[in-house]
Regions:
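Short, small-residue-biased leader/transition segments that mark boundaries at the very start
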Residues: 2-6
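Membrane-interface loop-to-helix entry segments
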Residues: 8-13, 84-100, 158-167
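Interfacial helix-loop-helix junctions of multi-pass membrane proteins
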Residues: 141-162, 212-214, 219
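Juxtamembrane interface elements at the cytosolic ends of transmembrane helices
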Residues: 62-70, 94-113, 171-176, 208-216, ...
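Transmembrane alpha-helix boundary signature
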Residues: 1, 24-37, 52-67, 106, ...
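Central hydrophobic cores of alpha-helical transmembrane segments in multi-pass inner-membrane proteins
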Residues: 14-30, 101-110, 168-178
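Membrane-interfacial loop-to-helix junctions in multi-pass inner-membrane proteins
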Residues: 24-48, 111-132, 157, 180-196, ...
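Contiguous transmembrane helix-bundle modules in multi-pass membrane proteins
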Residues: 159-166, 216-311
Length: 311
């Protein structure tokens, strides 16, 4: 919680966790073909390079404060001095950043033109791990907010809460789709797009939390200028993913060798429901920004909108 209370330390935590994920991929993927493992690590390194560039040039946590040393520094907000908050931010970022690994495997498969189901078998454990960390982070935050009687209770549909829910929903759809693609060889294009979408939403969540463009009860560590850098990285990630898919996607074969009453059909329905839920949350979260951009006034989308659609 102390690292997340200042933007620069939060971004340092982000790149440190990505370095950890990259090291684990390098270690546990030793049995993969060398060219595939190299491509995955190159893509992770490219993401790391972009985040490090933003850290160094816009948000360096190593800037000296001397000679203006404060006589008595401010303590951490008492509400944040809680055991649950020791693990809540790191677990969230483990989930956020972990989405980069399935994205890297997806992009590596597109890069190599290897669009069979093999890459999904390599990617699925990492997607499950990222989903597990993100689930734990959300649960810890909800548990803390519930007994702390703050932040609107265990779930308030706050924009920052939504920023963690959207990649969680996308990753939930992704792990189901990865399993079916691995075992049945279907939904290959859909699985690729979900891999790109899940990581894009994790970057969008980072942007929303740290840019200050939204009004939130999580009002600490906002920086509109540096938020634009995250937005630029988001654009690069989405653009690179869509361009790679456009160049290589034509090689995919459409396979629909399953009946109406089958597990594959149920998975399609499941993914559609999850995707619609994600888009509903995305619309409600971004609508105030869109309205303000078009001079439609200050609009607040709160629990009544989400409760009406979900409950």
């Amino acid at each position: 919680s102390a690292a997340s209370d200042v933007y620069k330390r939060q971004l340092l935590l982000w790149v440190t966790i990505l370095a950890g994920w990259s090291a684990m991929v390098a270690w546990f993927s030793r049995g993969l073909p060398l060219n595939m493992r190299a491509r995955v690590l190159v893509i992770l390194a490219a993401v790391q390079l972009m985040m490090l560039a933003m850290l160094i040039f816009t948000s360096s946590p190593f800037e000296r404060t001397l000679p203006n040393v404060p006589v008595d520094g401010a303590d951490l907000n008492p509400l944040l001095q809680d055991p649950g908050l020791i693990f809540h931010p790191p677990m969230l970022y483990m989930g956020y950043v972990g989405m980069a690994v399935p994205f890297a495997f997806c992009m590596a498969a597109l890069w190599a033109g290897r669009l069979d189901a093999v890459w999904t078998r390599w990617s699925r454990p990492w997607a499950l791990a990222a989903w597990g960390f993100l689930t734990l982070g959300i649960a810890l935050g909800s548990w803390w907010a519930y007994y702390e009687l703050g932040w609107g209770g265990w779930w308030f549909w706050d924009p920052v809460e939504n920023a963690s829910l959207m990649p969680w929903l996308a990753c939930t759809a992704l792990i189901h789709s990865l399993a079916v693609t691995e075992k049945r060889g279907v939904f290959k294009a859909w699985t690729i797009m979900l891999s790109i979408f899940a990581f894009a939403l994790s970057l969008l969540g980072t942007f929303l939390v740290r840019s200050g463009v939204i009004t939130s009860v999580h009002s600490f560590a906002a920086d509109p200028t540096r938020g634009l850098a995250i937005l630029a990285i988001l654009g690069i990630v989405i653009g690179a993913g869509l361009i790679a898919f456009a160049l290589r996607g034509w090689r995919l074969t459409v396979e629909s060798n399953y009946g109406v009453k089958s597990r594959e059909t149920l998975l399609v329905i499941n993914n559609i429901v999850i995707l619609v839920a994600t888009l509903v949350v995305l619309l409600g979260t971004l609508y105030p920004i869109i309205a303000d951009s078009f001079n439609l006034g200050q609009v607040s989308v709160g629990p009544p909108y989400f409760n009406a659609l979900f409950v």
